[in-house]
UniProtKB/Swiss-Prot annotation:
Protein family membership: Belongs to the lipid A palmitoyltransferase family.
Protein name, UniProt field: Lipid A acyltransferase PagP
Pfam families the UniProt entry points to: PagP
Catalytic activity: a lipid A + a 1,2-diacyl-sn-glycero-3-phosphocholine = a hepta-acyl lipid A + a 2-acyl-sn-glycero-3-phosphocholine; a lipid IVA + a 1,2-diacyl-sn-glycero-3-phosphocholine = a lipid IVB + a 2-acyl-sn-glycero-3-phosphocholine; a lipid IIA + a 1,2-diacyl-sn-glycero-3-phosphocholine = a lipid IIB + a 2-acyl-sn-glycero-3-phosphocholine
Active site feature: 60, 103-104
Length: 190
């Protein structure tokens, strides 16, 4: 519960910070080579659509884990979150998100991050995207220390609904298995 409250506090603080920013150039204090990053974040936050995320599946790679291990893991990674996203002038997708879900050991795992997808239109309503996400998460089995990361991300967009997936790489050393999980999530643009 503390982690959920922490995630919500971060979201509220970011929203308050964005609302309080009244200057015409909110990224003026950023180092010059990071200004485009700030400007894209600001654009996504102020012009983007509100999103509701939901998760529900985490597939543990059967080539890495034993049947006994897989049976002990939670593959129904129920959770949800909020975000903001937009398609830029080139049609590529940018998203800011804060989510929390049940990890492989049924512990609550929060994550906040940014995702970028290079998209291709299949037709007017259907797009496919491939890109990455950079995020910060924390896990009980790592003493709840904030852990930064970068992951591949793929998605299918249909009107306001998105189905996305990422693969969390890991180690397959015997006795030290971790990662190697396909994580699925969905998003509805409000």
């Amino acid at each position: 519960m503390k982690r959920l409250i922490s995630c919500l506090t971060i979201i509220c603080a970011l929203n308050a910070s964005a609302a309080a920013e009244t200057t015409s150039n909110p990224c003026s204090r950023w180092i010059s080579f990071l200004k485009p990053v700030c400007q894209r974040f600001h654009q996504t936050w102020t012009e983007g659509h509100d999103d509701m995320y939901f998760s529900g599946y985490a597939w543990h790679n059967r080539y890495v884990y034993s049947n006994e291990k897989i049976k002990s893991y939670n593959e129904t990674a129920w959770g949800g979150g909020l975000g903001k996203s937009l398609f830029d002038e080139k049609g590529n997708w940018h998203g800011l998100y804060a989510i929390a879900f049940l990890d492989s050991h049924r512990h609550l795992e929060p994550a906040v991050g940014y995702a970028y997808l290079k998209t291709a239109s299949v037709n007017k309503d259907l797009k496919a995207g491939l890109g990455y996400s950079v995020l910060v998460t924390s896990r009980v089995d790592y003493d709840n220390v904030p852990i930064p990361g970068a992951l591949p991300w793929a998605a299918l967009f249909y009107k306001r609904i998105t189905i996305a997936a990422t693969y969390i790489p890991g180690s397959s050393r015997e006795g030290h298995e971790n990662g190697n999980v396909l994580y699925m999530l969905g998003k509805i643009s409000l």
